[in-house]
Amino acid sequence: WEECKKNVSGYPTAKYKSFPTKEQAQKALNENYWEHVGKKNTPAPLLPNATAPYDTHSIAVDAACSGNPGTMYYRAIDLSTGTIYFSQGPFLRATNNIGEFLAIVHALAQLSLSGDTRTIYSDSKIAISWVKQKKCKTKLPLEAANKKVFELIERAEKWLHTHTYTNPILKWETQLWGEIPADYGNKK
């Protein structure tokens, strides 16, 4: 740390983040800052002694939001490899339920491109029901700051109405399996 400190002292707004490996740190340097700030470096582990009766050859999605509304992110993790399948955000003046909905539809659309019928897990009953109804039933008002989010919602709803899919969309059982592996790890 002392050697590192010499290189970073004097920068009053510097932000610090550690990574398990030099390769992961280098990769993060080449990516968008917002994909890494405030986030765990690894997917959430299963609870001790938890078994995995869920399909490990599947995708897990999750969203995080700093308020209601707030700054929202969403992502998917490939459970067979533990790698990030996609990551989106930040989106301003959004909600967690919107992020969960967009994450599920994004996963469906991405998987459909290659005919992949893997299961998608989400820990949001609300978002799963919105996807089944092909409608994001948010009560959030449209405003200039969240215009991009509403464009994505419109696009997602259109995709649901114009495409079919056979991917099971299942509720992640947090009480049995621990936090969903796509979790951002920022719960208080």
Predicted regions and their residues:
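Short aromatic-glycine-(Arg/Gly/Cys) micro-motifs in beta-strand/loop hairpins
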Residues: 1-13, 28-38
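Low-complexity, Ser/Pro/Thr/Glu/Lys-rich regulatory segments of predominantly eukaryotic nuclear proteins
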Residues: 26-52
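RNase H catalytic domain
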Residues: 65-68, 108-186
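RNase H-like nuclease fold core
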Residues: 46-99, 110
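A short, exposed loop/beta-hairpin motif centered on an aromatic-Gly-Thr core
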Residues: 10-21, 92
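Helix-coil modules at protein/domain termini and other flexible surface or pore-lining loops
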Residues: 7-9, 18, 88, 178, ...
